[in-house]
UniProtKB/Swiss-Prot annotation:
Belongs to the transaldolase family. Type 1 subfamily. It holds the Pfam family TAL_FSA. Keywords: Cytoplasm, Pentose shunt, Schiff base, Transferase. It comes from Prochlorococcus marinus (strain MIT 9515). Transaldolase is important for the balance of metabolites in the pentose-phosphate pathway. HAMAP family: Transaldolase_1 (MF_00492). This is Transaldolase. GO terms for molecular function: transaldolase activity. The active site is at residue 135. InterPro entries: Aldolase_TIM (IPR013785), TAL/FSA (IPR001585), Transaldolase_1 (IPR004730), Transaldolase_AS (IPR018225). It comes from the Bacteria.
Length: 333
């Protein structure tokens, strides 16, 4: 009998949520997603020190002589994300998602500039922009930046998405793909209610993604829905049939070892049609987010967490840069 993972792969595009190249080799997904926390975890792995060194060297060569260390490290953050993305693309047939610095989440212009820069870095390696999804936080400013980028042919993946309002704003902006989070919504409800067991269709994260998916299919939106941030395999099974699901290696492994029948829960050929067409201008969007305590808290928490991961990655790169310089000094004496 086919494993649950094999069955899932036949009805949903399975995406690996990792920067671990060995895990990608093992599970052979079509697409892969990264974020600052995943890149940081991979960068700490001694197996990838060569990749870090290449990123630092490339950054040094791309900047004029005499630039400050802070400018070099800022450039290296972009380069290391692209270097990991490049290596991932060598292992998959589809797309990789590379995230814009989360500290730019409330700056439309800076987000657009950073995204263009990342695409140009990929282009320097001969990688077509069709294979890249630029990940941007689902703030109002992020959605507006993505709307500009999409018109330039730069495809975007809007992340840290926790409610219906964010999703619809992305669809109306004709964004390529959204990543509605599941597990982080569950985390919030567990804390707020004191209830630990939200199983199957009762899982608030599953309910959120199902609502978004069904509305998108009812209205014929082209924006792809990729469920993300899972806490258990039951959440994944409840979203079988979703356009895409991005799954951490530990759950890919668990699903690959499990047998039994997987039931398709989401269907793009949905029969019921919603009579309501939702539109959110900036005022409506901000009010909706303000009124949604869960979405507001989780969006803020996510941006803060990814920002801290970038800062830690900067420290790691600076430390490695100093080590390389010291090695050169020793070799020269």
């Amino acid at each position: 009998m086919k494993s649950i993972l094999e069955q899932l792969s036949s009805i949903t595009t399975v995406v690996a949520d990792t920067g671990d190249l060995d895990a990608i080799k093992k599970f052979q997904p079509r697409d892969a997603t990264t974020n600052p926390s995943l890149i940081l975890a991979a960068a700490k792995n001694p197996d990838y020190v060569k990749l870090i060194d290449q990123s630092l060297e490339s950054s040094r060569k791309s900047l004029p002589n005499g630039v400050s260390e802070s400018e070099l490290i800022k450039e290296a953050i972009d380069q290391v994300s692209v270097f990991f993305g490049k290596e991932i693309l060598n292992l998959i047939s589809g797309r990789v998602s590379t995230e814009v610095d989360a500290r730019l989440s409330f700056d439309t212009d800076a987000t657009v500039k950073k995204a263009r820069k990342l695409i140009n870095h990929y282009k320097s390696f001969g990688i077509d922009k069709e294979r890249i999804l630029i990940k941007i936080a689902s703030t109002w400013e992020g959605i507006k930046a993505a709307e500009i980028l999409e018109k330039e042919g730069i495809r975007c993946n809007l992340t840290l998405l926790f409610n219906f309002c964010q999703a619809v704003a992305c669809a109306n902006a004709k964004i390529t793909l959204i990543s509605p989070f599941v597990g982080r919504i569950l985390d919030w409800h567990k804390v707020k209610t004191g209830k630990d067991n939200f199983s199957g269709k009762e899982d608030p994260g599953v309910i959120s993604v199902t609502k978004i998916y069904n509305y998108f299919k009812e209205k014929g939106f082209k924006t792809e829905v990729m469920g993300a941030s899972f806490r258990n395999v039951d959440e994944i099974k409840e979203l079988a049939g979703c356009d895409l699901l991005t799954i951490a290696p530990k759950f890919l492994d668990e699903l690959s070892k499990e047998e039994g029948e997987l039931i398709k829960k989401l269907d793009e050929n949905i029969q019921s049609k919603s009579s309501i067409d939702y539109e959110f201008d900036e005022k409506d969007f901000r009010l909706s987010m303000l009124e949604d305590q869960m979405a507001s808290e989780k969006l803020s928490e996510g941006i803060t967490g990814f920002s801290k991961a970038i800062e830690e990655l900067e420290e790691l790169l600076l430390k490695r840069f100093s080590e390389i310089n010291n090695q050169k000094l020793i070799s020269a004496t």
